Amino acid sequence: MRILITGATGLVGNELVKLLLAKGHTIHYLTTSKDKIEAESNYIGFFWNPQEGKIDENCIFEVDAIIHLAGANIAKRWTNAYKQEIIESRTLSAELLFNLVKKHPNHQIKQIISASGTAIYPESIDEIYDETTKETEDSFLSNVVKKWEASVNVFQVLGIKVCKLRTGIVLSKKGGALPEMVKPIKLGFGSAMGSGKQIQSWIHINDLVALYNFALEKRLDGVYNAVTTNPISNEVLSKTIAKTLKKSIWLPNTPEFVMKLILGEMSYLLFSSKNLSANKILDLGFQFQFPDIEKAIDDLYQ
């Protein structure tokens, strides 16, 4: 299969490219840096600039599927300008791809798989939400998810299947939230956040890239929660990390107002509680390699 990937050099993209190449697929990837363009037989780069509406049209030649991972990092301080970048880096890129595919009706693209977020779901500790949930949260990130998904849904009018993976906290040693949680615990200053009771729906990086591959092979359509079967509290996550690192957590929980002073509105990421179901993807036969938090953290840090 020939697959076009946006965000191929990001945390998830890097690992996904490795897996897809190992399975014999050919990768086309889009980059905003002309000096990062490679042209190997099975890994070919193409220039684009979504802000300026520029894209090398050859990128979709003989492509069977698109995987859309591009998007500015949400773990940075949310100034008004950066909020706009968070939205546009996801939506303008999808719109540029849509217009390109629409311009070439003889394309052979059958599916687009897009990253998405769990922020769209209501806050919850006890109630478990699944993909049929109509109620949504009223927050900046929830609105990002709505605009993000709307920007890829338009591919349906071209007869292309649209699969959206609403991704929880991605556990990886190479980036994302986990290394930031590990740092203070390693130094002996770790603590749970707020009440510590907020639920974190998470997924190991290996399971996430396997899920993208599963969605590709099964040519999935619709929304799926990319989270493991066992959501946990922030307190349990903190204690599990400490146990694996052979450290203890002795400090009192960090109050929410302190983190708001330090991080601003972005502190939402630490205190948000999303209790989500993975049943929809399980019912299709997907199997998690790391369903339990202890095994996931041990795999990454032992």
What are these regions (language model features)?
Residues 2, 217-265, 298-301:
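Mid/C-terminal beta-alpha module of Rossmann-like enzyme folds, strongest
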Residues 3-23:
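N-terminal Rossmann NAD(P)H-binding glycine-rich loop of SDR-like oxidoreductase domains
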Residues 44-92:
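NAD(P)H-binding glycine-rich loop region in Rossmannoid oxidoreductase-like domains
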Residues 88, 125-164:
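Catalytic helix-loop patch of NAD(P)-dependent Rossmann-fold dehydrogenases
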Residues 95-138:
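Conserved Rossmann-fold NAD(P)-dependent oxidoreductase catalytic core, especially the SDR/UDP-sugar
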Residues 153-156, 161-164, 168-199, 241:
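NAD(P)-dependent short-chain dehydrogenase/reductase
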Residues 182-190, 198-231:
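Alpha-helical substrate-binding/gating segment
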Residues 268-302:
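C-terminal amphipathic/interface module of NAD(P)-dependent oxidoreductases
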